[in-house]
Amino acid sequence: MGTGFSKKKKEARLIQQQMSLVQNELQNLEVVGVAGSGLVTITLTGDGEMKQVKIKPECVDVEDLEGLEMLIRAAHADAHKRLKEQSPPIPGFPGFLA
């Protein structure tokens, strides 16, 4: 077990430390997606879990539930996009959350 093994072991330890830092950053990250000029907002945590959904009463029309569904999907897509933009990069894994 020469220096090559030691070097790989150090590299593995460094990657592990970097991943730990990224995980900590993701735990503290929250993003808000918006649709319909704020009629619907969705908050996602750094690991992609939906934390909160807010729907303003004026956008609820029982005759047009499809419109509300579209707003919810749009707010979720916006939140997911923001999450990808704000997530810390993972060294060696470009586009990890893409």
UniProtKB/Swiss-Prot annotation:
Q: Which GO terms describe its molecular function?
A: DNA binding
The UniProt keyword set, sorted, is: Cytoplasm, DNA-binding
* CC terms in the record's Gene Ontology section: bacterial nucleoid; cytosol
- Is ATP-binding tagged as a keyword? no
Coiled coil ranges: none
Q: Report quaternary structure and partners.
A: Homodimer.
Report the PANTHER family cross-referenced here: NUCLEOID-ASSOCIATED PROTEIN YBAB
Sorted alphabetically, which NCBIfam families does this protein's record hold?
DNA_YbaB_EbfC (TIGR00103)
Official protein name in the record: Nucleoid-associated protein pc0477
Organism of derivation: Protochlamydia amoebophila (strain UWE25)
